[in-house]
Amino acid sequence: MRTVKKFSIAFAKWVFIACAVGVIGGVVGSLFHMAVNFATGFREGHSWTLYLMPLAGLFIIFSYRVCKVNEETGTNLIISSVRGNIKVPLLMAPLIFLGTVLTHLTGGSAGREGAALQLGGSIGAKAGELLKLDEKDSSLVIMCGMSAVFAALFGTPLTATFFAMEVISVGVIYYVGLVPCIASSLIAYKISLLAGLAPTKFNITGIPRLSLVSVT
């Protein structure tokens, strides 16, 4: 009976934490989705923004220097923070948000997957710090943040869940994070739908015929 009670308390605790992180991650991910879409649409309609790319790059570097955040800080830091007790600076989130939007606005090359992990990881790390969680629990809440922002950004809660569980270590899945991560992902995904954001889709226009030429 004591074991069941202990498990129930732990389960309820993590569902609550995961949902809270999912709400925050859903809002941030939805705003990020809107900002990137706006920046991309504006650039496509105003090609002169390409000439602003050098200035945007200088501004991004300047922002990192002013905020005293290493420019090389990125997805690797988030992964390291899950593996060990490495602190993630909170300022990393707005810097990644602004830097990615400016890059898309000026025609630069920047993927959204890494930005989603970094945004979510920063949110999760701060949540773990505020809740005074130990190293193991902090790692789990960081994964929840990663799942939440990824789900809100791409509209793929299941993919977000397993991506966050797998990206930490190649060939290893952190099954302990399944329930919290999927809870965060579903909450964040629902928020993105409420914000009017449709899941990202990629249309396949044609499938090449299978032949020696196509497989070599």
PLM regions: where:
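Alpha-helical transmembrane segments and immediately membrane-proximal extracytoplasmic
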Residues: M1-T216
